[in-house]
Amino acid sequence: MFTNIVPKFEKGRILKTAMLENLRDFPREYADIYYRDYADGIVTGANIEVAEEALTVTPGIVKYNGRLYLLNQPAIVAYQATGRETVVKIRFHEGAVDSDWNIYRSDIVIDEHIESRPSELELCRFKLKEGAKLRQDYQNFRDLSTEYNTVNLLHVRFAAYGQSTVSPFIMRYFGDELLRRGSSEPQDLAFAMMSLNEGILNRKVITHYIANRLGIANKDYSNVEIHRHLARILESVRGGGGRMGMSSGGSLRVIVD
């Protein structure tokens, strides 16, 4: 499970080995300062790996309620085919205090309550039919939103400056597919390179690109809406590229008789 354990160094208390190991293994002050202005979400890791009857959550760091939580060993979560939408979540608990530690713990749970509560953070969701196999071998960018038998990462929040953002897996997938389709638009090339190189992009960068590329309003789109708009951009590249609703050729000329 994800934990946030802080040793309490106080005058008159016995210094314990575990307290020093905690201090050694996690440079707390540096990390807290570095991510202070980041919104809650996954900081790094916490990827989902699919096996036949269980999911593995890989080691990672998440931010919740201003605190960093560390998962230093893979966590195994069993799942079943129910035909209903199921969400894998981190559920955070109230903090506890004893003479040596401030402790903030969590559990990784599978829940059919789709909306995440204030004390929860989504890791993925899926809707698995009985007799089918859960998969994550996406065939294309659209496939990321396939309803049945597919790991869905669209609703996952990643920590970023100011506000949470879209999974870097989704953005890298988009960047790779955009380049492979051969777009000649300079903004496409720049955005694709940035997506592949950085992964975690500020949400405003994504929405500005979408608005400019599609000629639509720049709004705080949801993760699902962002995916849908990015898929439209990929489809426009297949059809010849260019800003939608505008000529993909050179400059326009007007001849007056």
Give the positions of each predicted feature.
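N-terminal "first-domain core" detector
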Residues: 1-62
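Beta-strand-rich solenoidal segments
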Residues: 5, 9, 62-257
